């Protein structure tokens, strides 16, 4: 399972419908949080994501709308008896901010919280995935992130295995795990009955940024690109000045990268009552686009073999 839950999809100013930035990814039961704006823990409760399975927080940058939810979240998990360590990853300044988070409100955390500063190209290795930090273009030190699931084993050729004398049961399982088996004095190797590894899924999270080369390259053939889509195209001048992106700009990037699904987030408060201009500008260029809404969920399927 790879499920994306959009906890906060608003821009710099929260609105009645949109919380500040926060996106959680549930990858086979492990929770990864990308940005943690004010009110994120309540959104997690509303979405019923749980929080004790949260292993890491990836902060794109330290503007307030992307991190103010962290102090309350880490304190709540301490009150609930969390013992497992939590790592907060982010750009320059992450260690210093993390030390501040840990002492706000005189909270005596009952578990370890550590801050790790990443540079573009750095890789965080998980159980069955990696997260790669990307150089982005914003007005403060900033990073985007590419979540890349490990390749899956190739498809098992049952008919070929039987043809080679392997009976269904434990020997099938051994071959599927990459181990050779012996049948009637003959060695059957996994590569004889298991196809080439199949690619895992890729989700790219831009954080706040102008359209940039690093996000483009990371998004090539990605399953999902979650990108700053703050403004409609008519606001191109202000988007450039404030170091954000327009819907049309991001759609062009997604089209060039060959993304399967584009999701626009960090929606400016000027579109509180109507995201039509953003959606229309993006769909002129790239059809498979969604403007994210708070508590929206997106399942990311495996690609057909």
Swiss-Prot record:
Q: Which reaction(s) are listed as its catalytic activity?
A: Endonucleolytic cleavage of RNA, removing extra 3' nucleotides from tRNA precursor, generating 3' termini of tRNAs. A 3'-hydroxy group is left at the tRNA terminus and a 5'-phosphoryl group is left at the trailer molecule
Q: What is its EC number?
A: 3.1.26.11
Q: Which residues bind Zn(2+) 2?
A: 65-66, 208, 266
Needed co-factor(s): Zn(2+)
Keyword Transmembrane helix part of the UniProt annotation: no
Q: How is the cofactor bound?
A: Binds 2 Zn(2+) ions.
Ordered alphabetically, the record's keywords are: Endonuclease, Hydrolase, Metal-binding, Nuclease, tRNA processing, Zinc
Q: Does the keyword Hydrolase apply?
A: yes
- What InterPro entries has UniProt attached to this entry? Metallo-B-lactamas (IPR001279), RibonucZ/Hydroxyglut_hydro (IPR036866), RNase_Z/BN (IPR013471)
The UniProt record gives the binding positions of Zn(2+) 1 as: 61, 63, 138, 208
Group of enzyme by EC: hydrolase
Q: Report TM segments.
A: none
What Pfam families does this protein's entry cite?
A: Lactamase_B_2 (PF12706)
A single Gene Ontology MF term assigned here is: 3'-tRNA processing endoribonuclease activity
Active site, renumbered: 65 (proton acceptor)
Cited PANTHER family: ZINC PHOSPHODIESTERASE ELAC PROTEIN 1
What does the annotation say about its assembly with partners? Homodimer.
Family assignment from sequence similarity? Belongs to the RNase Z family.
Which NCBIfam families does this one have? Answer: PRK00055.1-3, RNase_Z
**Which purpose does this protein serve, as stated in its record?**
Zinc phosphodiesterase, which displays some tRNA 3'-processing endonuclease activity. Probably involved in tRNA maturation, by removing a 3'-trailer from precursor tRNA.
**Name recorded for this polypeptide:** Ribonuclease Z
Q: Which organism is it from?
A: Methanosarcina mazei (strain ATCC BAA-159 / DSM 3647 / Goe1 / Go1 / JCM 11833 / OCM 88) (Methanosarcina frisia)
Recall the taxonomic lineage recorded for the source organism. Archaea, Methanobacteriati, Methanobacteriota, Stenosarchaea group, Methanomicrobia
- Gene expressing this chain: rnz
């Amino acid at each position: 399972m790879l499920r994306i839950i959009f906890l906060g999809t608003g821009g710099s100013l929260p609105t009645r419908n949109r919380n500040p930035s926060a996106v959680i990814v549930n990858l086979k039961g492990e929770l990864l949080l990308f940005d943690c704006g004010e009110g994120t823990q309540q959104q997690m409760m509303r979405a019923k994501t749980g929080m004790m399975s949260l292993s890491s927080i990836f902060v794109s940058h330290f503007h307030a709308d992307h991190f103010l939810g962290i102090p309350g979240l880490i304190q709540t998990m301490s009150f609930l008896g969390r013992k497992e360590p939590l790592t907060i990853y982010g750009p320059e300044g992450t260690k210093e901010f993390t030390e501040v988070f840990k002492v706000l409100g005189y909270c005596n955390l009952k578990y370890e919280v550590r801050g790790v500063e990443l540079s573009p190209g750095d890789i965080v290795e998980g159980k069955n995935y990696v997260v790669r930090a990307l150089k982005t273009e914003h007005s403060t030190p900033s990073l985007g992130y590419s979540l890349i699931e490990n390749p899956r084993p190739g498809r098992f050729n049952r008919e070929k295995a039987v043809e080679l004398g392997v009976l269904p049961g434990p020997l099938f399982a051994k071959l599927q795990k990459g181990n050779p088996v012996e049948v009637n004095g003959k060695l059957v190797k996994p590569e004889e009955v298991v196809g080439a590894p199949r690619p895992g899924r890729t989700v790219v999270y831009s954080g706040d940024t102008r359209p940039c080369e690093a996000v483009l390259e990371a998004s090539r053939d990605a399953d999902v690109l979650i990108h700053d889509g703050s403004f409609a195209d008519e606001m191109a001048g202000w988007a450039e000045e404030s170091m954000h992106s327009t819907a049309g700009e991001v759609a062009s990037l997604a089209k060039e990268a060959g993304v399967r699904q584009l999701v626009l987030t960090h929606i400016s408060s000027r579109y509180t009552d109507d995201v039509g201009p953003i959606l229309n500008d993006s769909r002129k260029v790239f059809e498979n686009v969604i403007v994210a809404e708070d508590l929206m969920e997106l399942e990311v399927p495996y690609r057909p073999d």
